[in-house]
């Protein structure tokens, strides 16, 4: 399939345990700073564990500054990151040529753990999306993608295809998830949690460290040479198991091959591989 529109990533932002904003996160990474700390909050886990949590005090301050402190925590993060993207780019969601994609695996799942002032339906992804889109007056142009660990990649591919098919000129893609008791107990049941900082692909690896974050990018059909180009992407389904991919790697192989074909890229052209593996045990 030949595409005539190029999709650029023109702006980005991120909130994580390493900081608020892309620059703070970059500086922390360049300084070899880790966001992983020992967590003892019973709302997160029954027993202490190593994880990366963002500053609740800073989140509360920023949420109060824009009047969203009454929203669930996940929605606060989405609104803050999207707001920052709008501030950077000048692109508003009231513009009907701009779409909004929210990517998450669990959304407001933390609301299940305790009684709150929020209605029961707040835990549903559609309600989370409705609240966030309502804040930005974009109720008719919000889409939610929840596809386990590839939710973010799936959302970027969906945004790219929307631009290529002329549905939108620009798309804000935001993704986020929180650390909650639901999440830690789930990974704990798989015995996937490490008691030390994780060592991906190391011979002595023994699990992962969980974390929470929220980020957003602006995809656009217009850009310059200084912008990142989203040149190819693909999603496959190996129909293996709900909690694990095929051991033969067929699904991953098909997705990589299709993405490279779409981008017109050969294996020898690849200089960096960003790999993801849950616990990699």
Q: Which residues fall in each region the model found?
A:
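Structural element of the ATP-grasp superfamily
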Residues: 82, 132-133, 218, 256
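Acidic, glycine-rich active-site loops and adjacent beta-strand->loop/helix elements
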Residues: 14-15, 104-107, 147-151, 175-180, ...
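Conserved catalytic cysteine-centered active-site region
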Residues: 3, 37-76, 107-158, 167, ...
